[in-house]
């Protein structure tokens, strides 16, 4: 029994390590880029100059996927990455046009306020899409692999226990 205990514990530890690895990989691939983009958009919303705002929006664009929709079950335009990317391009263009205006003028302040409101809407859309990122095709596939490994480990343990009982009864 003691000789089979070590491989069983090694299998359990390997299973735990595999599960942690899958969780980290899934987060890094599906969730972190959008979370990082949300951080840049938040900084852009609080930016006080159009140049600063445009730089943060460009950084957010680089982090976000260029196309696709995380809500793959019932996709909407609200969470379509291509449309969000287009909105961010428009925001950069508006920020560049505002930068030529006189600071603290009515036009300048109105333009910045409009951009900040647009950024807030985009952030809300991305936050609404975030739960669906956890249910991406990749994450479902990796979870299925992890469950298959757990079931295989239990089958091996049951087979080992049956073999141990048979040896014990034969003594």
Language-model segments: residues:
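Hydrophobic secretory-pathway targeting helix
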Residues: 1-37, 138-161
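Short, Lys/Arg-enriched, disordered terminal segments
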Residues: 1-5, 166-171
